[in-house]
Amino acid sequence: MNILAIDTSTMISTVTIASNDEIIGDFNVNQQKTHSESLVPMIENLLNLLGMEIKDIDLYVIAKGPGSFTGLRIGMTIAKTLAQVNGKKLIPISTLLALANNSSSDKLKVPMLDARGNRVYGGVFDKDFKEIIKEDLYTIEDFSALVNELDQEVELIGEIGKKYQDKFPKGKILPLNFNNCIGKSLIKLAIADKDKNFNLYEIIPNYLRKSQAEREMPKELKDRLNDKKNGQI
């Protein structure tokens, strides 16, 4: 089975390909271009380097978020299009769960992504990747308080961990290679979920909050859209 995984949750564009449970290609680019400019060429280039075509892919995997609103939309749209056009299954995976899976230690894992304004997307997972603290949008003060209440050594996973390390007295920063690229973890989790059924048309990004445009939308317009959604106009 050939699996293609995509992650556009952050500034890093990731495309990873596995064949028969072995990673054969892993392409990660942190650049100023938007994911819409870089992602499709990355997929095409990696397939070409491996001597493969898109028709050779049997299963697609997408990091569903949380993360960058724009990035998640782009990645999800491209992944769903590829799966639909080629008649293949798409498996959505939590970005935070994939980030936690970058570590295989017995310590509690605390994956975090920057949500700006002293806020983080975060969660806590045990050594078996069972969710201990629900992944959600938190202020760093609230999240660190919840983690510190556990009174255990934890691994801070994600590039934002270094910025907030002082908030976690028992927190350990992992080396750089643990903190961003999650393609291999997406493949690992997708293999575990490959027999589950996912409705392609019901797979959507997990933003964990409204977009800036939605938050700043005038109340009158919000009310009109809600009325329309409820069939009142």
Predicted regions and their residues:
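Short glycine-aspartate micro-motif
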Residues: I3-A5, V61, G71, K109-M112
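Acyltransferase
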Residues: P175-I233
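DPxDG-like acidic metal-binding loop motif
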Residues: L59-L90, T95
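Short beta-strand scaffold segments in enzyme catalytic cores
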Residues: S13-A18, R119-V124, N206
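Surface "functional belts" at beta-alpha junctions
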Residues: E22, K89-C181, Q212, I233
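Residues at secondary-structure transition points
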Residues: N30-S38, F69, R73, T77, ...
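N-terminal beta-alpha supersecondary unit
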Residues: M1-K64
